[in-house]
A protein has these predicted regions:
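Polytopic membrane enzymes that build or remodel cell-surface glycoconjugates and lipids
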Residues: 2-221
Length: 221
């Protein structure tokens, strides 16, 4: 009798060990996935780090001694949050402060350095791709799709597709990356809310939704 009990304990402990290993394995897998995404992003767009500013970057950074709010650094953030996106002569439109906020923070750290700003764009795009991967995985789980190729191949295609070149390689277009990333984060949190029915999930959901809107108005289109 004691032998049977001991065998059962061994089986239970073995099962518990496997269950305890799963979170660690999942965490390791997530790290590997993100690092692979980061590697592919830098292979595809890494040459943009050597680029200078382009003409459109003048909307978000101080070029040719233009008096822009971002050149005030962190101290200019309150004014950025209460200003239009573009306030030129006869042209005033848009409200998308979050991209400018990131540029103001960067200016406080290293002032105008296009190479580091391009580097930040690549990191943000890698995060964007990883969030999209999590979204695809959630959709695959919802529809019981077990073929991992249907999840990973679209991600690979998304990274290397040339349509993203302008967004990733233009510092001004960081707002597009931020907008989509915050929307993906909001959707992933909504899935959590829909599963667990815990109201407090709605708080980060609303925060990320508003951050997407503050990145670019098209978040609500």
């Amino acid at each position: 009798m004691s032998k049977k009990v001991s065998k059962q304990k061994i089986r239970i402990s073995g099962q518990n060990q496997k269950l305890s290993e799963k979170p660690g394995l999942n965490s390791y897998k997530r790290y590997v996935e993100f690092l692979l995404i980061l590697l592919l992003v830098f292979i595809t767009y890494g040459n943009s780090i050597q680029n200078d500013y382009n003409l459109d970057d003048g909307y978000v950074v101080s070029l040719d001694n233009a008096n822009l709010l971002t050149s005030k650094g962190i101290s200019g953030i309150p004014e950025i949050l209460t200003s239009k996106y573009s306030e030129g002569e006869g042209v005033t439109y848009g409200y998308r402060p979050f991209g400018k906020v990131t540029m103001a923070i960067e200016y406080s750290i290293w002032q105008n350095n296009p190479h580091l700003s391009h580097f930040v764009n690549l990191l943000l795009f890698a995060i964007n791709v990883y969030l999209l991967l999590l979204f695809f995985k959630r959709i695959a789980t919802m529809f019981n799709i077990e073929n991992s190729a249907l999840v990973y191949l679209p991600i690979l295609f998304y990274i290397v597709h040339p349509i993203h070149t302008e967004v990733v390689c233009s510092i001004k277009n960081r707002e597009e990356i931020l907008c989509f990333s915050f929307l993906l984060a909001a959707l992933l949190i909504y899935f959590k809310f829909n599963e667990q029915k815990k109201w407090w999930y709605l708080v980060p959901f609303l925060v990320f939704t508003m951050l997407a809107f503050f990145s670019k108005e098209t978040a609500f289109n």
